[in-house]
Regions:
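Alpha-helical transmembrane segments
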Residues: 12-16
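Bacterial lipoprotein signal-peptidase II cleavage site
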Residues: 23-31
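C-terminal motif of bacterial Sec signal peptides marking the signal peptidase cleavage site
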Residues: 18-21
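Bacterial N-terminal signal peptides that target proteins for export
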Residues: 1-9
Length: 544
């Protein structure tokens, strides 16, 4: 009778939970999972539980009572296991020497592969810092590098912007301590730390509200006095990088832009006060910020954790790094075996990143239901938080294809402020864009921007501006000469190897044969029509 009662009670509990969850599901819209397409081989079930009941909704007592007795279902581990990396043998329960080698090789490969993915944001920032120091000759925080003639394709930044005047700042708070950054009205952009985490915005979305001012960047662990009169921000790392930018309509180009920066921008340690700054025009200068796709990336990881405080990374990440021989405060000398594993891990991690970025399985990646345009910020925030977790695939999509973390490009800003980006790797038919073919994008009239819009073409191998005979692979509403308009005010932009007959050159972006390309639309100062989607861009269309 007691057994009958317990079964009857369990049945009532399962029914109640089923009805409760059905009610919940009817009122709450859930994100659809695309993972169902990636099925695993069927395995035998060891738990007999009603499939309509969400196990996560059950208390621990009900959960345990719903399972068969452990001793009934116990099955010892297998002596022989077939895996994708070979057969594993455990005669008598213990591994053979061959199995030990295979498992440790695979374990190290998996850990190294995941570390490459997890540390990609920090590696990307490390590449930015290295590229500026190595290729631009930056040797102190008081060197301000300016793309006074705009950023051309020689500057290999991930999906760099061809239309703005950039000011690149390399800050070293370990060397300089609290550092002052003076910015004028008309300059905007983020300051990001060595982990590529957002520190502060400058400009209309920053503390200066677009009026300019003095920012004081405080290093980790600093406990000294902080004077008044500054916009004070705290960084969790010593090394920081800023991508400030200005509209050429405000600051001009070339020498005019350099004059504006020299007269209005300064960077110096708080301790020393203003010191001599060096201003250099880096337009047309070759610079590579890309993360190595081989074992060198793991040397970068070692450099990162060696320079920054341990608190910037956390014990879990540092523990996984230590498991493959990368430990803070100790030499990093991988043997031939580990170098080979790290080379393979980098290749596999990059392959995963390319698939995640170019064919993302998250349905929230699409901006519009019936268009191919995607947002680099799938979560619509710069932290990649989704409720109580971090969307690690969304984070990888962004950092593998873009630079510069700021809420101003992700979160909904007031109409006319901030900027929003959209990208597509595919044409209207859902096929990847092919450099051997000819395409057209019609920018419909009345693009919803308070400032300007631009369309830029990138190389899927580097994710940087595509390198062709055009130094600036873009078309924009502020381009000179202006792109030709159709009678209704729309703009047709063409993508092909050669200029199509009868098409104005300012409406054409050159592509490369035998490789793909992808396209970004940038909206500067997006207005209400952008946010409420009463204006929707066309897809890129195949001509032939």
């Amino acid at each position: 009778m007691r057994n009958f009662k317990s079964k009857w009670t369990l049945s009532l509990l399962l029914l109640t939970l089923t009805l409760h969850n059905c009610s919940q599901n009817s009122t709450k819209t859930k994100k659809k999972s695309s993972h169902q397409a990636y099925s695993l081989p069927e395995v035998s079930k060891t738990m007999d539980i009603n499939s309509t009941v969400e196990r996560g909704a059950m208390d621990i007592y009900s959960l345990a009572r719903s399972e068969p007795s452990s001793n009934v279902n116990y099955k010892r581990a297998q002596d022989n296991i077939d895996t994708r990396y070979g057969k594993l043998e455990f005669p008598g329960g213990y591994p053979t020497e061959a199995t030990i080698k295979k498992v440790y090789d695979e374990l190290d490969l998996q850990r190294a592969t995941q570390l490459y993915l997890d540390m990609y944001p920090a590696l990307s920032m490390h590449g930015m810092l290295k590229g500026n120091i190595r290729d631009y000759g930056v040797n102190s925080s008081s060197v301000i590098s300016v793309t006074a003639n705009r950023l051309d394709s020689k500057g290999m930044y991930l999906t760099g912007n061809t239309e703005s005047i950039y000011l690149f700042l390399v800050l070293d708070l370990k060397k300089d301590g609290p550092t002052v950054v003076e910015v004028p009205q008309g300059v905007m952009g983020p300051l990001d730390d060595h982990n590529f985490l957002f520190v502060a915005d400058v400009g209309p979305t920053g503390m200066d509200k677009g009026k300019g001012g003095k920012y004081l960047i405080i290093p980790p662990g600093y406990d000294g006095d902080i004077p008044e009169g500054y916009f004070v921000v705290n960084s969790k790392t010593y090394a920081n990088f800023s991508f400030l930018r200005a509209n050429k309509d405000i600051v001009g180009e070339g020498e005019r832009a350099m004059k504006f920066v020299r007269e209005n921008c300064k960077v110096y340690p708080l301790e020393t006060g203003p010191r001599e700054n060096k201003y250099q025009n880096v337009s047309g200068v070759d610079m590579n910020s890309l993360v190595p796709e081989n074992a060198e990336a793991f040397t970068w990881m070692y450099e990162l954790i060696s320079y920054e405080p341990a608190e910037a990374f956390g014990k879990e990440l540092l523990g996984r790094l230590e498991s493959i021989g990368i430990k803070k405060g100790e030499d990093f000398n991988p043997d031939t075996r580990m170098v080979n594993i790290m080379n393979q891990a980098a290749l596999e991690a990059v392959a995963m990143s390319r698939v995640i970025a170019f064919n993302n399985r998250d349905e929230n990646g699409k901006v519009y239901k019936d268009r191919e345009w995607e947002s680099p910020y799938i979560t619509n925030n710069s932290t990649f938080y989704e409720d109580d977790y971090i969307d690690i695939e969304a984070r990888q999509v962004f950092h593998f294809t873009a630079d510069g973390i700021t809420p101003a490009m992700a979160a909904r800003m007031p109409d006319g402020l901030g900027s929003r980006y959209q990208t597509t790797y595919k044409d209207k038919n859902g096929d990847f864009l092919d450099g051997n073919k000819n395409y057209k994008l019609r920018m419909l009239p009345n693009v919803p921007v308070a400032m300007f819009w631009s369309v830029t073409v990138y190389d899927p191998y580097s994710r940087c501006e595509i390198k062709t005979t055009q130094p600036y692979p873009s078309v924009s509403s502020q381009k000179e000469p202006k792109p030709a308009l159709n009678d209704d005010g729309s703009v047709d932009i063409y993508f092909s190897n050669e200029l199509p007959e009868g098409i104005a050159e300012q409406n054409w972006v050159q592509t490369l044969p035998d490789q793909g390309f992808f396209v970004y639309i940038r909206y500067y100062g997006p207005t209400a029509e952008f946010h409420n989607q009463s204006w929707i861009p066309n897809d890129v269309e195949l001509i032939y």
